[in-house]
UniProtKB/Swiss-Prot annotation:
Assembly information from the UniProt record: Part of the 50S ribosomal subunit.
UniProt xrefs under PROSITE patterns: RIBOSOMAL_L13
Family statement drawn from the similarity comment of this UniProt entry: Belongs to the universal ribosomal protein uL13 family.
InterPro entries: Ribosomal_uL13 (IPR005822), Ribosomal_uL13_bac-type (IPR005823), Ribosomal_uL13_CS (IPR023563), Ribosomal_uL13_sf (IPR036899)
PANTHER family recorded: LARGE RIBOSOMAL SUBUNIT PROTEIN UL13M (PTHR11545:SF2), RIBOSOMAL PROTEIN L13 (PTHR11545)
Entry protein name: Large ribosomal subunit protein uL13
The species this protein was found in: Lactiplantibacillus plantarum (strain ATCC BAA-793 / NCIMB 8826 / WCFS1) (Lactobacillus plantarum)
Amino acid sequence: MRTTYMAKPGEIDRKWYVVDATDVPLGRLSTVVASILRGKNKPTFTPNVDTGDNVIVINASKVALTGKKAERKIYYHHTAYAGGLKERTAGDFLAKEPTKLIETSVKGMLPHNSLGHKMGLKLHVYAGAEHTQQAQKPEVLDITNLI
């Protein structure tokens, strides 16, 4: 009888990928990155085990916001004080904190539990073209054929 393969945390080979966000639409970039973080690109994918790889996103400040999302898309957060609902547009978010914009978008596409939090820790976003993970020897991932 055949049984379904279930990955174990010790058996997982993790790779490092570098993704260039220059002129890539935010949503398309986020879906590809979230899929890699979950491990859905591997034949050993198991939903209840973190089988994903590490992803480095560079040039976050050059990500594309299509249409009128820069003015019309609004991100909300609450300060936990009365009347503390804050809002900012995607354009302001991109101008002031481009790394946080991509992190927010990708983490919203991961599971909302402790496993999703562990997956989110493998995401490294940089506003410029330089990153500090050269020691891991990351592979350059061209996402134009994945989107």
